């Protein structure tokens, strides 16, 4: 789609890291965002927005284990579920992406429509273990997964891999 109304970039692990080195994809994201009403990402999709130059000097978020890697792209990382900075929105992870999506639904279709959507998807979070205690986060486990994803996804891009790995 050459000029989408909205652009949403999903995240992931090795596949997303590979996408960072796909110049054609990064160029498309940059060009599509130039005309889109809104550009958004979920989870590590924000790294692709960063690679496209869309996060420079903007507040942004991503999965907590990759949060500091946003600095590599000139972003101002913030630890929030989702962030809106102008026409660019970023969500920290999958569940936070639902929060951001409901915000966008309200923006585009009104709060009543967004509430209907919330009922339609039965979104009423009740985590079985309560809220997260970020001081107890299994950082080494997730940083190990991040390092593995970067190693696999950016095997042919050693300089970028090294810069991002240093931020984990």
Regions found by a protein language model. Name each.
Residues 1-168:
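Active-site-adjacent pocket-lining segments in enzyme domains
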